[in-house]
Amino acid sequence: MPLSLGAEMWGPAAWLLLLLLLASFTGQRLAGELETSDLVTVVLGQDAKLPCFYRGDPGEQVEHVAWARVDAGEGGRELALLNSKYGLHVSSAYEGRVEQPPPPRNPLDGAVLLRNAVHADEGEYECRVSTFPAGSFQARLRLRVLVPPLPSLNPGPPLEEGQGLTLAASCTAEGSPAPSVTWDTEVKGTASHRSFTHSRSAAVTSEFHLVPSRSMNGQPLTCVVSHPGLLQDQRITHILQVAFLAEASVRGLEDRKLWQVGREGAMLKCLSEGQPPPSYNWTRLDGPLPSGVRAEGDTLGFPTLTPEHSGTYVCRVSNALSSRDSQVVVDVLDPEDAPGKQVDLVSASVVVVGVIAALLFCLLVVVVVLMSRYHRRKAQQMTQKYEEELTLTRENSIRRLHSHHSDPRNQPEESVGLRAEGHPDSLKDNSSCSVMSEEPEGRSYSTLTTVREIETQTELPSPGPGRAEEEEDRDEGIKQAMNHFVQENGTLRAKPTGNGIYINGRGHLV
């Protein structure tokens, strides 16, 4: 009776409590496991889903799921309780922020949604699941709340051409975790970084320094911020403004035909550039601007030109940084004195000198060629004449010799005949012989010597082998004849005798 009464007093809750106590005392899990994530990441302001799914044997039931925040060093704070019979119960601290996932729902799924996550929600959470009849299970996860940065770009001080290294801009971004800040630009410069860490976030500041120049004016300087909480990098662009003023120059005098008396539409234009944009002012050195001349910004327009418009005009370019001047001399000419009709003496002189130099060079070449041809022709003529005279002299000498050899009796007493070597009537001597004639029309020594040379150069037939005996007799006759002559000063003279002529049967010797 008491036992039955006690059994009737125990309800399902008592039996469940008993099973939990038995499971806790034994320290063993009967069956099943919890599936969750070690880390859940959510961007600030978005909903975070805290997963907790019980995977057990068929027939097991999840009675209730309890969520609590269990940060290190702090006690557990109840978040919510899900009961299979009574539904969801949320603690007052998270009222309106914790919900169940939208249907359909699995009875074994104990996940909850944390709406509109804030950075304070970052921490560690525990899921405790009570099942029947397996008992209770628990698992932990960490919630990470990403705080995307909101970058800001601050321009540096005004940039001026000629400055040294100057701050162009700084870019700051704060988030959790610390963001990455870089620069995207074609401008040459250097970047420096500084970071500051707070309790729940970190700030990064990057500065970009450069040396200003006019080429940088108008160039983009972009700050690029990267962060895990951003779907794509954030970019902030700053356009550089570098103050400068370029040199001034005046154009309009290139076509001199426009600057003649009576012409219209003549104008001068002042060229310059700067930042900020410059202003233009036209003046005239030798007085005020002539009447009718109008200045409109960088342009100075002239009416119908007259000689009074001649003068020196000055264009002054100014901006907040500096000012520049440029001047030109305007000379309005009469049509008769237009540059197109004037003779450029310098150019003409250069052309004349060039033409004269070319003509002289050509003349020099012609003279050299003609002189060369003349000397060549002269040399040929002299050579030909010399050969003709030499041939004629040889022919005369040979003809004379032939006439003497053909008839010795016809030779005049005044002449002296010299025979070539090898002739039976000649005198043979290794030295040159000279014969002086005593007749009034006798020949000189030089003439006889020349004849001797010519005769010697004349080729005569050499004696053959059959005339050897004649050669010996001739030599003997010469030896006998030499007994009657004496040699003085290179001349043969007859020895004093009663008869000055020696007659040999083989020939006549003088």
Curated annotation (Swiss-Prot):
This is Nectin-4. Glycans are attached at residue 281. It comes from the Eukaryota. Gene3D superfamilies: Immunoglobulins (2.60.40.10). Seems to be involved in cell adhesion through trans-homophilic and -heterophilic interactions, the latter including specifically interactions with NECTIN1. Plays a role in the senescence-associated cell size enlargement via SFK/PI3K/Rac1 and thus promotes senescent cell survival. Also participates in the innate immune response by acting as a ligand for the receptor TIGIT to inhibit NK-cell activity. The lineage of its organism: Eukaryota, Metazoa, Chordata, Craniata, Vertebrata. Residues 400-412 have a biased composition (Basic and acidic residues). It is found in: Cell membrane; Cell junction, Adherens junction. Residues 400-475 are annotated as: Disordered. One of its GO terms (biological process) is homophilic cell adhesion via plasma membrane adhesion molecules. Keywords: Cell adhesion, Cell junction, Cell membrane, Disulfide bond, Glycoprotein, Immunoglobulin domain, Membrane, Repeat, Signal, Transmembrane, Transmembrane helix. The keyword Metal-binding does not apply. One of its GO terms (cellular component) is plasma membrane. Its main location: membrane. SMART domains: IG, IGc2. Self-associates. Interacts via its Ig-like V-type domain with NECTIN1 Ig-like V-type domain. Interacts via its C-terminus with AFDN. Interacts with TIGIT. Residues 32-349 are extracellular.
